[in-house]
Amino acid sequence: MSSNGLVLVSGEALVDLIPREETTYEAVLGGSPYNTAIGLGRLGVATGFAGRLSSDTMGEALVKELSASGVDAGFSIIDPRPSPLAFVTRGTAATGSRYSFYLGATAYDGPSPLVADWAARAAHLHIGSFSATDGALGAAALVALQGAGSDATTSYDPNIRPFVVPPRAETLPMVEARVKLATYVKASDEDFDWLYPGTPPSEAAARWAGLGPRLVVMTRGGAGAEAYFKGERIVQPAPSIDVVDTVGAGDSFMSALLAAMAEDGALGSGAHDPSEAEVGRWLLFAIAAAAITCTRQGAQPPTRAEVDKVLGSG
């Protein structure tokens, strides 16, 4: 990585309302990019978060958790309006969770904190979820990808949420524009099913690998993950676990994938095209992190020690 070695994550931060009983919800800090930043911090990666955060009680909690996880929140904008909300319907390892978002008139709605010259302060930029294609936030994310230059790398996770993104015909070109610019891309088989109905997800993922990224990774829930690069395909199964909650599992996978890449010198200045051995190692690490997250309630990404213990390397 470049001299500062920072991974900058940009996107939404919100509060997940997760059902605990029929009429009881628990407020849990979340948002896909936010979870990814927290996960990176817990894995020991120097991380910054560029998001729009409220000054209300929940916004203060979001900032506090970033700090506790070793993430620099100084790239973010603080807004006096309330924190955005997401009502979560729990899923299984096969189906994943479902979300209903409440974003209007909240801190989410406003100018992007992501500046075009971000590469002067960070080695790698990760963008993701609906904020990467939504209005002014999405436009800023696209400009940021375009401005990466030769000394920085980028990654993108579309994390499609059908009930918050525009119709497919409008969303697909925006997603593909970002795929073409990103160094690395991660998406789920559900993302591909929604974006390309009737096309096998593996075929769509292989097609993305030909659009420009060095690597495309597709997660398949309880079936593991696949990687596409240099015309090759690597398949890595997931371990058998007792699933408690799938919320945040994909974000834990993303953060662990980036952490493993950083360790192998695949982020920032001097980043190289990955080898088959490296990609296999990255998938194992990311799948282990996601599996740990599925064994506990809420988006709770693991620490490096927890992942190492599962892999037998700690």
Where in this protein do the model-derived segments appear?
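Proline-centered loop/turn at the N-terminus of a beta-strand
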Residues: 6, 46, 153, 184, ...
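Short beta-strand scaffold segments in enzyme catalytic cores
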Residues: 38, 85-89, 224-228
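Conserved beta-alpha-beta core of the PfkB/ribokinase-like small-molecule kinase fold
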Residues: 124, 129-206, 223-225
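Short glycine-enriched, charge-decorated loop/helix-capping segments at active-site entrances
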Residues: 22-27, 104, 272-273
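Glycine-rich phosphate/adenosyl-contacting loop at the front of the ribokinase-like
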Residues: 1-71
